[in-house]
């Protein structure tokens, strides 16, 4: 499967954005900007999936669940909860590397009572199955698709977004158990983890401590296996990122505050491991940071790996004419860092 890297993205009427346009996007994109300017909202906007619209809605519903916000029912739709103006459609414009044409996806809230006769014929089965008062209409090119909130109960899928609060959880137990079936994968995974745990022998699942299986690590000179949850945030984050990159192969992964919990002395090696794994798996990364140290180590990691052409810094700023984005290629943000210019 060919990797799909966004090179251009524009979203309209999404959360606080009337319109946010981002161009010259790279494979690796570090997103910076002031607090509450919309960095996290930008990551959430990137959860669109024009190839699987049900998964797209499920992704946004996962955002709500993660934030402990009311999910979808027959009185609410994604447009109500994510659109700046729920009466207006959300619009996505996007272009992929090696795909010359720009595409548009429109997401609109519709009332059940607004269906025309020909539309009723199209969704007659869904009307019988779901009592929802409202539904979502997707317009992609000349095609239209309809999804009712009740359908989301049947949709389960991987959610390619890592909130900054997410560290250890049952999901990575599931991720690991599915991947560790492969001995070659497990050996490579352990090699990557030894960047942070030099004495690591192996990683395995155990239910000796709790009824549910947990991830434990065995190290040299330690008789007992240690639960992953007892390790530091940096180790657990690397563990999670390496797993999630596997599930995002040939797609994109959004990471909020990628450097939080990572000691500065480990940050460059941490970023190198994440970037190299993403390169190997053809994953496009969008990650936020507030840290100037992270910018500097990101630059050094790209240099060490020879990936300067793939790196970008995207700044989101609240200007007099609204929220805008500014993309810096490697040479531009390298010069800005050298000159001491503030680009965060």
Where are these regions (language model features)?
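Switch/communication elements of ASCE P-loop NTPase nucleotide-binding domains
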Residues: 1-52, 222-344
């Amino acid at each position: 499967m060919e990797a799909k890297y966004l090179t251009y993205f524009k979203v309209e009427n999404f959360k606080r954005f009337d319109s946010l346009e981002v161009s010259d996007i790279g494979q690796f994109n570090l997103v910076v900007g002031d607090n509450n300017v919309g960095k996290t909202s930008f990551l959430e906007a990137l959860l669109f999936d024009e190839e699987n619209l049900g998964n797209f809605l499920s992704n946004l519903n996962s955002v709500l669940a993660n934030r402990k916000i009311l999910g979808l029912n027959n009185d609410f739709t994604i447009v109500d909860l994510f659109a700046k103006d729920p009466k207006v459609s959300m619009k996505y414009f996007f272009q992929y590397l090696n795909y010359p044409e720009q595409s548009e996806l429109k997401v609109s809230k519709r009332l059940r009572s607004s269906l025309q006769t020909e539309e009723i014929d199209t969704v007659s089965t869904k009307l019988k199955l779901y009592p929802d008062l409202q539904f979502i209409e997707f317009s992609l090119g000349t095609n239209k698709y309809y999804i009712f909130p009740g359908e989301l109960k049947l949709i389960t899928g991987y959610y390619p977004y890592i909130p900054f609060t997410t560290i250890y959880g049952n999901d990575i137990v599931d991720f690991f158990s599915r991947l560790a079936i492969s001995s070659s994968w497990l050996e490579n995974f352990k090699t990557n983890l030894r960047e942070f745990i030099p004495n690591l022998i192996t990683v395995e699942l155990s239910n000796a401590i709790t009824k549910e299986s947990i991830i434990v690590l065995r190290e040299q000179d330690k008789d007992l296996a240690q639960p992953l949850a007892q390790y530091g945030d940096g180790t657990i984050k690397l563990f999670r990122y390496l797993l999630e990159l596997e599930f995002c192969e040939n797609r994109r992964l959004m990471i909020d505050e990628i450097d939080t919990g990572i000691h500065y002395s480990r940050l460059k090696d941490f970023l190198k491991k994440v970037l190299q794994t993403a390169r190997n798996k053809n994953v496009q990364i969008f990650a936020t940071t507030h840290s100037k140290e992270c910018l500097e180590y990101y630059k050094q990691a790209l240099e060490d790996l020879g990936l300067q052409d793939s790196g970008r810094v995207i700044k989101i700023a609240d200007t007099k004419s609204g929220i805008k984005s500014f993309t810096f290629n490697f040479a531009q943000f390298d010069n800005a860092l050298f000159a001491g210019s503030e680009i965060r």
